[in-house]
């Protein structure tokens, strides 16, 4: 959500930003917001004037009542003024109701206006216009065929999607044996990796209130992702970023405690409605998965430096497991409405001979802070909005696809990189059972 002051002072900037995001249908929202804001400010001003006048009249009544002890004729004037006060009270009640209604309407409109993107963001309508920035590691071209990832897992008796389908439907899985252990090893390694980077490890709530959902994401994203608990003001999180940023809702953060750097583990639950949907055969796009996440709450002037650090952490993590990756800059049309700048880290798939997304790093500026009413108290006592950022550390089982394909050997075994061996009981290799 953008600053109303910015919209008042530079509506053309907001309109141009909407065009850059190829959301021309939202252009009328600018005028609608300005009209609602003007009407609300007018109601506030009139109400303030009435309160001032009412206070003056009340004071006058007190003075006249004192005078009426000696001059009873003053009581007639008192009654006349009381009638004015009553009339003004009725009008004030109307104005206060208007203020409430106008503020609510304005808030809903402002939630729909996208955040101002960074000038460095490439302009394009959708993810087809995303720009490759840099590659890390040489893409592998094996001299033997790479099976589909579920076939690799099945060779270790490591997955049962048929049973999961009977129990829960499409988009669920059972991981077992060495594959389940590998899944947990990756999460444990990612946790320790981020702790070594100075982040505080946290296990957050896996369900959040509706006002937190509204604070961290757009309505369209919520509809496509979130599961609501029937009869409760609770939603299952789609990523622990939601509850981690939500931790600061309605809070005043002392500036000296910034940056807040947290890394969190959680299960994640997603409807996956939209263009992609659920993958029928595999575990790339599913309803339930586990993830290690990182978030940063920082001073506005530090957010771009943190953005650079955070996506590079992802690269370092994947390269430590011998997985080639690349950074892909997200174009304007591919950015969610709250994002200022974002990039994907994509892992190399030897089977498909192409990259696929495994991490997403985003700078959201002060959008989430404004929605959640997060504030920082500076050294001078003044309040300001912090910036928030988030990035995937690792999200198995999707990450396992990249891991298994890049570490698969011609005999069907999978090598375990040195960094994961302590988490796998010292194993250096997984041997297929089939």
Give residue spans per PLM region.
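N-terminal alpha-helical targeting/anchoring segments
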Residues: 1-140, 154, 158
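TRNA-recognition modules of translation machinery and tRNA-sensing kinases, especially anticodon-binding
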Residues: 27, 135-434
């Amino acid at each position: 959500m953008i600053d109303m002051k910015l919209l008042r002072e530079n509506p053309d900037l907001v309109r141009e930003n909407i065009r850059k995001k190829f959301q021309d249908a939202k252009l009328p929202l600018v005028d609608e917001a300005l009209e609602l804001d003007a009407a609300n400010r007018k109601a506030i001003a009139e109400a303030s004037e009435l309160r001032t006048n009412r206070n003056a009249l009340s004071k006058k009544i007190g003075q006249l009542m004192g005078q009426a002890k000696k001059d009873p004729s003053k009581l007639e004037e008192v009654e006349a003024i009381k009638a004015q006060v009553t009339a003004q009270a009725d009008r004030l009640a109307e104005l206060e109701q208007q203020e409430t209604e106008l503020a609510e309407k304005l808030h809903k409109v402002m939630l729909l206006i996208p955040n101002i993107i960074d000038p460095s963001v490439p302009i394009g309508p959708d993810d087809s216009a995303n720009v490759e920035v840099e590659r890390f590691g040489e893409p592998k071209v094996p001299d033997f065929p790479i099976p589909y990832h579920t076939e690799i897992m099945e060779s270790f008796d490591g997955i049962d999607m048929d049973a999961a389908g009977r129990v829960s439907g499409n988009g669920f899985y059972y991981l077992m044996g060495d594959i389940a252990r590998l899944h947990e090893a990756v999460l444990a390694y990612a946790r320790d990796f981020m702790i070594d980077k100075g982040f505080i490890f946290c296990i957050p709530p896996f369900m959040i209130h509706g006002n937190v959902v509204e604070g961290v994401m757009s309505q369209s994203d919520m509809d496509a992702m979130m599961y609501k608990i029937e009869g409760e003001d609770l939603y299952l999180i789609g990523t622990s970023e939601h509850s981690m940023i939500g931790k600061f809702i309605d809070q005043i953060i002392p500036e000296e405690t910034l940056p807040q750097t947290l890394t969190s583990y959680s299960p994640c639950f997603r409807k996956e409605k939209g263009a992609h949907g659920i993958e029928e055969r595999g575990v790339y796009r599913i309803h339930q998965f586990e993830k290690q996440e990182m978030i940063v709450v920082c001073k506005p002037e530090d957010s771009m430096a943190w953005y650079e650090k955070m996506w590079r952490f992802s690269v370092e993590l994947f390269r430590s497991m011998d997985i080639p990756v690349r950074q892909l800059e997200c174009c304007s049309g591919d950015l969610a409405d709250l994002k200022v700048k974002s990039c994907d880290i994509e892992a190399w798939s030897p089977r498909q001979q192409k990259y696929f997304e495994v991490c997403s790093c985003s700078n959201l500026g002060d959008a989430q802070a404004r929605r959640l009413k997060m504030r920082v108290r500076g050294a001078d006592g003044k309040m300001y909005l912090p910036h928030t950022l988030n990035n995937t550390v690792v999200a198995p089982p999707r990450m396992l696809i990249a891991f298994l394909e890049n570490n698969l050997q011609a005999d069907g075994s999978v090598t375990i990189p040195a960094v994961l061996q302590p988490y796998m009981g010292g194993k250096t290799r997984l041997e297929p059972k089939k």
